């Protein structure tokens, strides 16, 4: 009896010692630059951690910039996201599989101002950014948006970006070209694209530039 128990115990020790450890989640990007106080709440955690240059980013992260802060994030697919002050960004979904030609990204901004610079989109790709009122679908472009609970203002700097209301019951989509902007309120489709003046466009650029 004791011999069997000893043998079983030895077997369990061997199996435990040779078992592969749980794989750590893969990083999807890093903090490239920041000014001021910026924090992240990891998926499954409740407390915020301070961000620093080089901090790894993971799917499920919720990121915030405080008043006066700026933040630049560099992702593994070449995308760059720049946040102005008082901005909340959630990295809801991030799949980048270049060998399979697949890219599936969903970012969510509940408030604040941000810039997305998307350099490469794979053949089978879906890259979306959601705000409180709008959904932006892109296939390689440079654009800026400011989100409040009531409305989202968006301007394209390069390329094209398709914009629609986040509510499926409000149909209608506009496609912005370089220099064009639109506004999406909670209860209406996007406004017709109009060319923004230099002052308004440059203000958006300045507010999302990280020194």
Task: Please state what every model-predicted region is.
Residues 1-4:
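Positively charged n-region of N-terminal signal peptides that target proteins for export
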Residues 20-211:
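Flexible, surface-exposed loop/linker segments and immediately adjacent secondary-structure boundaries
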Residues 7-17:
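Bacterial N-terminal signal peptides
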């Amino acid at each position: 009896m004791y011999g069997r128990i000893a043998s079983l115990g030895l077997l369990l020790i061997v199996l435990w010692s040779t078992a592969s450890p749980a794989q750590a989640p893969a990083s999807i990007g890093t903090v490239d630059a920041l000014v001021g106080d910026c924090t992240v709440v990891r998926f499954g955690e409740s407390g915020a951690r301070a961000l620093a240059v080089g901090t790894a980013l993971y799917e499920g992260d919720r990121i915030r910039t405080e008043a006066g802060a700026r933040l630049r994030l560099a992702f593994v697919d070449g995308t760059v996201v720049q946040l102005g002050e008082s901005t909340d960004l959630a990295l809801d979904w991030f799949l980048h599989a270049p060998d399979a030609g697949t890219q599936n990204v969903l970012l969510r901004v509940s408030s604040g101002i941000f810039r997305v610079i998307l350099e490469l989109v794979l053949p089978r790709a879906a890259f979306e950014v959601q705000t409180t009122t709008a959904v932006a679908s892109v296939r390689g472009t440079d654009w800026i948006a400011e989100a409040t609970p009531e409305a989202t203002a968006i301007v394209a700097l390069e390329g094209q970006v398709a914009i629609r209301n986040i509510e499926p019951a409000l149909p209608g989509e506009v496609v912005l070209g370089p220099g064009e902007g639109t506004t999406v309120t909670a209860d209406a489709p996007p406004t017709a694209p109009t060319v923004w003046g230099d002052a308004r466009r440059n203000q958006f650029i300045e507010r999302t530039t990280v020194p």
